[in-house]
Swiss-Prot record:
One of its GO terms (cellular component) is cytosolic large ribosomal subunit. It comes from Brucella anthropi (strain ATCC 49188 / DSM 6882 / CCUG 24695 / JCM 21032 / LMG 3331 / NBRC 15819 / NCTC 12168 / Alc 37) (Ochrobactrum anthropi). Part of the 50S ribosomal subunit. Contacts protein L32. This is Large ribosomal subunit protein bL17. HAMAP family: Ribosomal_bL17. InterPro entries: Ribosomal_bL17, Ribosomal_bL17_CS, Ribosomal_bL17_sf. The keyword rRNA processing does not apply.
Length: 142
């Protein structure tokens, strides 16, 4: 008997699952929208919701717990400053999961995971900054 059936194993070891969810949570906080498979999306939602709640709590212990979960100080700063302020009046339900069809290669169900009331400009921000830096370097070299 499997009492209290827990999370999905997703055909990975426990350490691989933990690392994958940490990376997915970091990507979601950075870009505010990611595309992944539906089972992964359903598993990442409670993780990120708890991180946002930590951000709303705002104390030092909560910050250290968030750092141990996503391992990126800049993203923790965004979580505690930007996202906590954005969702200060909302009690849960910070994440939206929308089905997005099926993947071409293996027909896996896809889903878009995004923050409710997300910042549209956050997606691809790092790529735009990198491209602008490369173009500035090329202009200086020429």
């Amino acid at each position: 008997m499997r009492h209290g059936n827990g999370q999905r194993k997703l055909n990975r070891t426990a350490s691989h699952r933990k690392a994958m969810f940490a990376n997915m949570a970091a990507s979601l906080i950075e870009h505010e929208q990611i595309v992944t498979t539906l089972p992964k999306a359903k598993e990442i939602r409670p993780i990120v919701e708890k991180l946002v709640t930590l951000g709303k709590r705002g104390d030092l212990h909560a910050r250290r717990q968030a750092i141990s979960a996503i391992r990126d100080v800049k993203l923790v700063a965004k979580l505690f400053d930007t996202l906590a302020a954005r969702y200060a009046t909302r009690n849960g339900g910070y994440i939206r999961i929308m089905k997005a069809g099926f993947r071409a290669g293996d027909n896996a169900p896809l889903a878009v995971v995004e923050f409710v009331e997300r910042d549209v400009d956050a997606k691809g921000k790092a790529d735009r900054a990198r491209v602008e830096a490369e173009q500035a370097a090329e202009a200086d070299a020429a």
